[in-house]
Amino acid sequence: MTKITLSDLPLREELRGEHAYGAPQLNVDIRLNTNENPYPPSEALVADLVATVDKIATELNRYPERDAVELRDELAAYITKQTGVAVTRDNLWAANGSNEILQQLLQAFGGPGRTALGFQPSYSMHPILAKGTHTEFIAVSRGADFRIDMDVALEEIRAKQPDIVFVTTPNNPTGDVTSLDDIERIINVAPGIVIVDEAYAEFSPSPSATTLLEKYPTKLVVSRTMSKAFDFAGGRLGYFVANPAFIDAVMLVRLPYHLSALSQAAAIVALRHSADTLGTVEKLSVERVRVAARLEELGYAVVPSESNFVFFGDFSDQHAAWQAFLDRGVLIRDVGIAGHLRTTIGVPEENDAFLDAAAEIIKLNL
């Protein structure tokens, strides 16, 4: 077959020179770079999933339940229990990972001539998804401590009048939390909708922004995922919680039968075993505290985190430091922020290997 490159294709001009999103997938002993839950699913969950798939396999010649009604019922029950906010399936929408959730929201509320504003550094897919939906992305820098500078944030929102504002809490890659008071201040000055990205909410003791939904029915959407705390990254299931009108909006842009029967069934099984799965959250939180404390003892600067990862520095060359960890068999994440790296919290043995490497690397003055 004739060899061609992207430059030979009639690609959209704004995509030329861009790079595909993705963390390195390398064959190393210790992988702490993608914020997965390191604990495998329980035997009971696996057995339940196998039995469920066996049951539905004879119906795979049929399209799946188009609107994922049973799954949305289960998600609503979980959110009601986890946040204390009473919701029903009419408040829930599910898709293939929170990335598809965010993409659908941008398709419905962004687009040509519209803007989305986010506080950087934050989840790197926000500007990528904005570009893919022809939505102009406005990046507002966080403060030196990586927290949102509220004075700057409110001033920029008033000046730029964005159609969408992203607030990620706990923030990825830094792990800090934006308070409900500050989220309300943002909502009150934002002319359009505010999407609060709570992908890591289960790791944080801070209250969920879902508690504000009744107060701001036309402006607030809370996005979540089952990829992190739920030990379900391979299942690719994201969802949002909002007023039912927002579900009506994304139904205008969603693809037909977008969630497969297998995805829906697997997510329902995971929710059925949520007590066991989420039992690992406390273990990971304890390990996060231990890892952060040890890094500080070694002389690293650590950003306070309420997630399943730790953001740390300061390095004069963070990529050289990343390579030094990799050379010691530990894969962590260089997210491109000067002087800093991010490590996912793994099982104790993985964290020990990471900390042993960190103890050696601090002496290299990288």
Curated annotation (Swiss-Prot):
InterPro entries for the chain: Aminotransferase_I/II_large, HisP_aminotrans, PyrdxlP-dep_Trfase, PyrdxlP-dep_Trfase_major, PyrdxlP-dep_Trfase_small
Disulfide links within the chain: none
Gene Ontology MF annotations: histidinol-phosphate transaminase activity; pyridoxal phosphate binding
Pathway the protein acts in: Amino-acid biosynthesis; L-histidine biosynthesis; L-histidine from 5-phospho-alpha-D-ribose 1-diphosphate: step 7/9
Enzyme Commission no: 2.6.1.9
N6-(pyridoxal phosphate)lysine: modified positions: K228
Cofactor: pyridoxal 5'-phosphate
GO biological process, one term: L-histidine biosynthetic process
Keywords assigned: Amino-acid biosynthesis, Aminotransferase, Histidine biosynthesis, Pyridoxal phosphate, Transferase
Reactions catalysed, as given in the entry: L-histidinol phosphate + 2-oxoglutarate = 3-(imidazol-4-yl)-2-oxopropyl phosphate + L-glutamate
Top-level class of the enzyme under EC nomenclature: transferase
Gene3D superfamilies: Aspartate Aminotransferase, domain 1 (3.90.1150.10), Type I PLP-dependent aspartate aminotransferase-like (Major domain) (3.40.640.10)
Family: Belongs to the class-II pyridoxal-phosphate-dependent aminotransferase family. Histidinol-phosphate aminotransferase subfamily.
HAMAP family: HisC_aminotrans_2
Subunit structure: Homodimer.
Protein name: Histidinol-phosphate aminotransferase
Species whose genome carries this gene: Corynebacterium glutamicum (strain R)
